[in-house]
Amino acid sequence: MKSVITTVVAAADAAGRFPSTSDLESVQGSIQRAAARLEAAEKLAANLDAVAKEAYDAAIKKYSYLNNAGEANSTDTFKAKCLRDIKHYLRLINYSLVVGGTGPLDEWGIAGQREVYRTLGLPTAPYVEALSFARNRGCSPRDLSAQALTEYNSLLDYVINSLS
């Protein structure tokens, strides 16, 4: 799994050197942000179902045509799969918060996602809308500390950009 620490060590090892001062500063910054990431991960884990449902509802409200016969959200099975996918992305964001890097997202969520959706004829815009809603709904200090919200939002942005 890729994290800041494993990335720094792997890069130094590949170059046949010890980690540089800037490498170690990067690791130190990641460690200093760990408490905020864990706060965000804990809140997300506790509220995953509610966050996913609100995000799903916002996406379907914007893209209501998807409920029409023959569209991507026209059956209960399709609706359940869409909600499942949103939960999957949020769970991977949770894992990424814990490890302090994008490894879980890169390995289990982003690699090949657009091709899969295109092959299945699924639009990515509703997923972008759902994740954007989750990002825009977060509020400091109501939901999370400012730093925890920043960590959470940066990973949401990472996924949104990969789907866009």
UniProtKB/Swiss-Prot annotation:
The keyword Thylakoid applies. Its main location: membrane. Contains two covalently linked bilin chromophores. It is a peripheral membrane protein. (2R,3E)-phycoerythrobilin 2 binds at C139. InterPro entries: Globin-like_sf, Phycobilisome_asu/bsu, Phycobilisome_asu/bsu_sf. GO terms for cellular component: phycobilisome; plasma membrane-derived thylakoid membrane. Belongs to the phycobiliprotein family. Light-harvesting photosynthetic bile pigment-protein from the phycobiliprotein complex. Heterodimer of an alpha and a beta chain. This is C-phycoerythrin alpha chain. It comes from Synechocystis sp. (strain PCC 6701).
